[in-house]
Amino acid sequence: VWNIGAEGQFTMGAIAGGGTALFLNTQESFLVLPAVLLMGILGGVVWGMIPAFLKTKFNANEILTSLMLSYVALLILSYLVHGPWRDPGGYNFPESEIFSDFAMLPILLEGTRLNLGTGFALLSVLIIYILLSRTVLGYQFKVVGLAPAAAKHAGFDRVKLIWLSMIISG
């Protein structure tokens, strides 16, 4: 499975997380940040499920569908920041309101923009590395990708693996 649409999944995750941050902008609770992160993850996952569905149901080419969906996600974002999410005090620039501090990741080094997202990214790389190189599921992903006939003969569930790969990439 080739997922060329990771940018679209990232964009839809940002839209879902950003929408949550804007919706909860007046809330002063430590639960806002986890809600924003969770909705961001769900946004990317749901966007990744669309090409998975099209691939498994209609045998659509996942390269084309995921790539085209990246453009759709970009257009949705453009619509939102030029329309309903535009900051009325933003001097007509296409941007949303500033998120509250409760919706922002903590800064790691004062005077920089380095935040906790760096740690999340490094942890994600480690988890995906372990998943792909040290687990049965990672082996199944490789076999389905490199030798679909062998995967079928071994009894690997191709449909399940396509769905999982697109969901994880979201």
Which residue ranges define each predicted feature?
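Single transmembrane alpha-helix segments in multi-pass membrane proteins
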Residues: 1-24, 37, 41, 45-63
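Transmembrane helix-bundle core of multi-pass membrane transporters
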Residues: 62, 66-134, 161
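Membrane-helix/interface signature in polytopic inner-membrane proteins
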Residues: 127-166
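Juxtamembrane membrane-interface segments at transmembrane alpha-helix termini
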Residues: 19-27, 51, 74-83
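Hydrophobic alpha-helical transmembrane bundles of multi-pass membrane proteins
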Residues: 21-22, 115, 146
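Membrane-interfacial loop-to-helix junctions in multi-pass transporters
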Residues: 25-33, 113-119, 158
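Residue-level recognition of pore/gate-forming positions within transmembrane alpha-helices
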Residues: 14-18, 44, 70-74, 125, ...
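Hydrophobic alpha-helical transmembrane segments
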Residues: 8-12, 34-42, 64, 115-122, ...
